[in-house]
Swiss-Prot record:
Required for the formation of a threonylcarbamoyl group on adenosine at position 37 (t(6)A37) in tRNAs that read codons beginning with adenine. Is involved in the transfer of the threonylcarbamoyl moiety of threonylcarbamoyl-AMP (TC-AMP) to the N6 group of A37, together with TsaD and TsaE; this reaction does not require ATP in vitro. TsaB seems to play an indirect role in the t(6)A biosynthesis pathway, possibly in regulating the core enzymatic function of TsaD. One of its GO terms (biological process) is tRNA threonylcarbamoyladenosine modification. The keyword Electron transport does not apply. Belongs to the KAE1 / TsaD family. TsaB subfamily. It holds the Pfam family TsaD. Its main location: cytoplasm. One of its GO terms (cellular component) is cytosol. Transmembrane segments: none annotated. Disruption phenotype: Cells lacking this gene display a slow growth phenotype. Cell size, shape and nucleoid morphology remain unchanged. It comes from Bacillus subtilis (strain 168). Keywords: Cytoplasm, tRNA processing. This is tRNA threonylcarbamoyladenosine biosynthesis protein TsaB.
Length: 229
């Protein structure tokens, strides 16, 4: 089985090729650039480097969000188009779960974080058990202050991952003290190779029914709905 993994859900643009249990190619950038004009060329480049054609792919795996609304849509649309045109399965993985996978060697809880503005974050709680990543608390959009108080009650070490942790480092330290750990710079980029491994084990989704998981409405949508009441 050869899997193509695609992640455009945040600043990170990640593409990976997984053949059986071997990562044969991986492309990652962390740049504030338009994924819509870079994602497909990156896929073609990676395939060409590996002397492969799209028809050699067995499955598509995509990061479904949360994250940048535009970024999530780009990745999901590209992945669905490829899966449909090639008539191969597609699986979707939480962007937070993908980031949490970077905490593989941490003995404790893992909280990946994307900033959601106004004191809110997208996050969830994960841990590794017997070498496998499992979800402890579902992904959600939550006030960071409330989230940290919940983590404090668990009284366990917590590893925070994601570039946006820099925005909240002081609050994390103030609430959790020595129980709060910030990941290294290398751990803050979600890796498409981890996305591929996670998606390999997930059931195939309906290619037409698969939609991004924003965890909340885009601001413009929310305002429109409110105006209709």
């Amino acid at each position: 089985m050869t899997i193509l993994a695609i992640d455009t859900s945040n600043y990170t643009l990640g593409i990976a090729l997984l053949r059986e249990d071997t990562v044969i190619a991986e492309y990652i950038t962390y740049l504030k650039k338009n994924h819509s004009v870079r994602a497909m060329p990156a896929v073609h480049s990676l395939l060409n480097d590996c002397d492969m054609a799209p028809q050699d792919l067995s499955k598509i795996v995509v990061a479904k969000g949360p994250g940048s609304y535009t970024g999530v849509r780009i990745g999901v649309t590209l992945a669905k188009t490829l899966a449909w045109s090639l008539d191969i399965p597609i699986s979707a993985v939480s962007s937070l779960e993908t980031l949490a996978a970077n905490g593989r060697h941490f003995d404790g809880l893992i909280s990946p974080i994307f900033d959601a503005r106004r004191g809110q974050v997208y996050t969830g709680l994960y841990q590794y058990k017997n070498g496998l990543l499992e979800q402890v608390v579902p992904d959600q959009n939550v006030m960071l202050a409330d989230w940290l108080e919940m983590l404090k009650e668990k009284d366990r070490p917590v590893l925070f991952l994601g570039h946006d942790t820099s925005l909240h480092k002081q609050m994390i330290e103030d609430v959790l003290g020595t129980k709060g750990f910030i990941g290294t710079a290398a751990q803050h980029n979600p890796r498409p190779s981890e996305l591929a491994f996670l998606g390999k084990e997930k059931e195939a989704a309906d290619v037409h029914g698969l939609v991004p998981d924003y965890l909340r409405l885009a601001e413009a949508e929310a305002k429109w709905i409110e105006s209709q009441k």
